[in-house]
């Protein structure tokens, strides 16, 4: 049981949480402030 707790507390869980939060942050930034490539398509 201690080995399972050690495994779950190291790299897989930490990297999953980090990349998940980073992806969510990038999605929200691109939703609120879209980059310049999409401006000509929405400025009719």
Curated annotation (Swiss-Prot):
Membrane among keywords: yes
GO cellular component, one term: photosystem I
Alphabetized UniProt keyword annotations: Chloroplast, Membrane, Photosynthesis, Photosystem I, Plastid, Thylakoid, Transmembrane, Transmembrane helix
Bilayer topology term: Single-pass membrane protein
Pfam name, any one: PSI_PsaJ
Compartmental location: Plastid, Chloroplast thylakoid membrane
Family: Belongs to the PsaJ family.
Function of the protein: May help in the organization of the PsaE and PsaF subunits.
Keyword Metal-binding: no
Protein name: Photosystem I reaction center subunit IX
UniProt record, GO biological process: photosynthesis
Primary residence: plastid
Entry-linked Gene3D superfamilies: Single helix bin
């Amino acid at each position: 049981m201690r080995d399972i707790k050690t495994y779950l507390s190291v790299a897989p869980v930490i990297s999953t949480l980090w990349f998940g939060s980073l992806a969510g942050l990038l999605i929200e930034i691109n939703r609120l402030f879209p980059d310049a490539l999409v401006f000509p398509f929405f400025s009719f």
